[in-house]
């Protein structure tokens, strides 16, 4: 009985196929339905392709505008269209700093921003969006950033009010300090040393100052 039922179904399908092949009304209807389905699919696919193309054109236009104008605004920070502090300030002559002198250059009391790493003082004014009063690393402005960079700490606990000789840092942390020092040397102007208590500042000639700046350029 099951086999018979199966035979009926198979024969019925076969008959339908033959009728379709003979051009019977059932076959014509199936063909028309298939044609309609294909046409609808093509229409939908074409519409989707058109929408994708339009979106791609809009994104391309937006990207070109960003490349031309967005980067400029991003680099200039909040004062878009205005010169950055680094652009308006003359290059700082090389000199040495005590902790008290260094603290004056925090970006708030003066537009110039300095910080120290491993006994070296760097002018980071051109990175004011990072080291300025509102920047994510503004806590280091006008301070010795060595301990904070070595311990990855952005809290006031990483700052010392007195000279920090870093003697309690381990070998890995000191290596990190030296790596940070090298990175700052590559990116920012080295403007002098951070003086230890009682240490006298060095006198730098114009020739030494020019030579150091030439190396950095």
UniProtKB/Swiss-Prot annotation:
Record's keyword annotation contains Transmembrane: yes
CC terms in the record's Gene Ontology section: endoplasmic reticulum; extracellular region; glutamatergic synapse; membrane; nuclear envelope; synapse
Modified residues (Phosphothreonine): 205
A GO MF term: steroid binding
Free-text comment on this protein's domains from its UniProt entry: The cytochrome b5 heme-binding domain lacks the conserved iron-binding His residues at positions 131 and 155.
Acidic residues: compositionally biased ranges: 200-209
Sequence ranges assigned to domain Cytochrome b5 heme-binding in this UniProt record: 96-195
Sugar-modified residues: 15
Protein name in the entry: Membrane-associated progesterone receptor component 2
Topology within the bilayer: Single-pass membrane protein
């Amino acid at each position: 009985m099951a086999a018979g039922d199966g035979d009926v179904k198979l024969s019925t399908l076969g008959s339908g196929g033959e009728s379709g092949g003979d051009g019977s009304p059932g076959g014509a209807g199936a063909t028309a339905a298939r044609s309609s389905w294909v046409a609808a699919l093509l229409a939908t696919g074409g519409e989707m392709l058109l929408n994708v193309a339009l979106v791609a054109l809009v994104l391309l236009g937006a990207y070109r505008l960003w490349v031309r104008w967005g980067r400029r605004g991003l680099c200039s920070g909040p004062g878009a269209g205005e010169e950055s502090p680094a652009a308006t300030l003359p290059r700082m002559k090389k000199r040495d700093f005590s902790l008290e002198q260094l603290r004056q250059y925090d970006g708030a009391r003066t537009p110039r921003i300095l910080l120290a790493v491993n006994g070296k003082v760097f002018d980071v004014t051109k990175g004011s969006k990072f080291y300025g009063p509102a920047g994510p690393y503004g806590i280091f402005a006008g301070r010795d950033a060595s301990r904070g960079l070595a311990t990855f700490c952005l809290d006031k606990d990483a700052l010392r009010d007195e000279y920090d000789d870093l003697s309690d840092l381990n070998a890995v942390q000191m290596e990190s300090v030296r790596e940070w020092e090298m990175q700052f040397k590559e990116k920012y102007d080295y403007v002098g040393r951070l003086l230890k208590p009682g240490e006298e500042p060095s006198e730098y000639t114009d020739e030494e100052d020019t030579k150091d700046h030439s190396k950095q350029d």
